[in-house]
Amino acid sequence: MRRTLAALTLAGLAATGIALAQMPTEVPGKPDPKLVVAGTYKIEPLHTQIGFSVVHLGYNPFMGLFSGVSGTLVLDPANPAAAKLDVTIPVDSIYTTVDELTKGLKGADWFDTAKYPTARFVSTAVEVRGTEARISGNLTLHGVTKPITLQARFVGAGNHPMTKAPAVGFEGRSVIKRSDFGVSNGIPFVTDEVNLTITAAFDKA
C-alpha cells in the first residue's frame, strides 16, 4: 500500500512538473485593451462564475454561486459599442455553503429549476468609457424577462498559454430585484435586492 501511495505521489509530482514546465514565464493576460482581437468569443466555463449575495435577517450578506455558464461575446475594438453578449446560466448549478439551503433554492418555492432550468442574458446596448462599460440587456429568469444593466470592467487580454488563441476577461456587477422575476419567498427576511458579481473568461472561437 505504501509503495502504491509513493508511486502515485511521484507520478503526481512529475505531472505537476511537466505542467509547470509548459507554463509561460510571465502572465499572458495584460490589462491593455490594445491586445483585444476582434471576433466572436466563447465563454470559458471553468473560469467563469456568477456570484450573488442577499442580506439575511438584516444581519449580514449571505453569498452563493452559479457555475457552468455558457455563451458568446462579439467584440470589435474599432467599434466597442457594437459588442454583443449572450449568456446562458444553468440555474441548477446554484451553490451555497449550506446543503439544505442549496437544495431548497432549487425547489418550487424559489427558483423551481425543474421547470426553469436556465436563465439567459442578452445585451441590447453597450456604452463604453475607457476600460469600463455599461451593458444594457434583457434577463430571463424564472420564466420572466426584464431589462437590467451590468457595469463591466475590462481585466485583461492576451493569447491563452494552452490553446494559443486570443483570450479576454472581464468582471461585472449588477443589482436586481428577485420579486421582479416572481421569486418573492422570504421577503423581507431575505432581501428582495440581489447583488450580482460576475467574473468571466472568454476564448476566441
Question: Could you say what each language-model-derived stretch is?
Answer:
Residues 20-205:
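Low-complexity, acidic/polar, glycine-enriched regions of mature
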